């Protein structure tokens, strides 16, 4: 009977170690996910800025495709 108790104690100890490792892994994954979300949010802000800049660009200084001279290989 004492052997059974020792085996159960070893199994419980092993499960506690696994649980602690999993908790640490979950915390690390949560931190990584939070950092990625911040990066995504920052990139969305930057993208909106770039799109806004492109929309306000003066396209009148650009030539139409029909006015462009063809490349030399034509």
UniProtKB/Swiss-Prot annotation:
Domain of life: Bacteria
Protein name per the record: Protein SlyX homolog
Organism the protein comes from: Aliivibrio salmonicida (strain LFI1238)
A Pfam family that the UniProt record links to this protein: SlyX
Family according to the record: Belongs to the SlyX family.
Coiled coil: none
């Amino acid at each position: 009977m004492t052997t059974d108790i020792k085996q159960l104690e070893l199994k419980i100890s092993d499960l506690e170690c696994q649980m602690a490792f999993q908790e640490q892994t979950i915390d690390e994954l949560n931190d990584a996910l939070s950092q990625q979300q911040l990066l995504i949010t920052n990139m969305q802000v930057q993208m909106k800025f770039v799109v806004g800049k492109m929309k306000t660009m003066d396209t009148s200084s650009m030539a139409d495709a029909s006015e462009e001279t063809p490349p030399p290989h034509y």
